[in-house]
Amino acid sequence: MPTIQQLVRKGRESFADKSKSPALNSCPQRRGVCVRVYTTTPKKPNSAMRKVARVRLTNSKEVNAYIPGEGHNLQEHSIVLVRGGRVKDLPGVRYHIVRGTLDTAGVNGRTQRRSKYGAKRPKPGQAPAAKGKK
């Protein structure tokens, strides 16, 4: 344990917080190109086919990014906008793709939380879009 005199001379060393999305280089979002679009399964208690894309960012780093919402139009060479935010049950996926920007279409038929999924406001008086897959 240091003496008060040692603390006066040297002080305590403070540790800087580590970034949770280091590939973005302190930027809120980054543009990138899809290298591979695929599905993967989540960790143990959960079961699904989660849609994920491998994206090469403009700073030439490659990351795995989650594609939120139901259905998407992404394929290889699509230009996407990537934001931070991990997916808890997918190890190694620490980024999200922003829906409704660049080559990524918004989610069709979405009426609630539309801004999160890039969905346009439905016309007033219009019948709600059909739910489910046909």
From Swiss-Prot:
Regions that span the bilayer: none
Gene Ontology molecular function: rRNA binding; structural constituent of ribosome; tRNA binding
Annotated region described as Disordered, given as residue ranges: 1-26, 103-134
The entry's keywords: Methylation, Ribonucleoprotein, Ribosomal protein, RNA-binding, rRNA-binding, tRNA-binding
Gene Ontology CC annotations of this record: small ribosomal subunit
Composition bias type Basic residues, residue spans: 111-123
Modified residues (3-methylthioaspartic acid): 89
CDD domains linked to this entry: Ribosomal_S12
Low complexity: bias regions: 124-134
One GO-annotated biological process of the protein: translation
Basic and acidic residues: bias regions: 10-20
Job description of the protein: With S4 and S5 plays an important role in translational accuracy.
Family: Belongs to the universal ribosomal protein uS12 family.
Subunit-level organization: Part of the 30S ribosomal subunit. Contacts proteins S8 and S17. May interact with IF1 in the 30S initiation complex.
Protein name, entry field: Small ribosomal subunit protein uS12
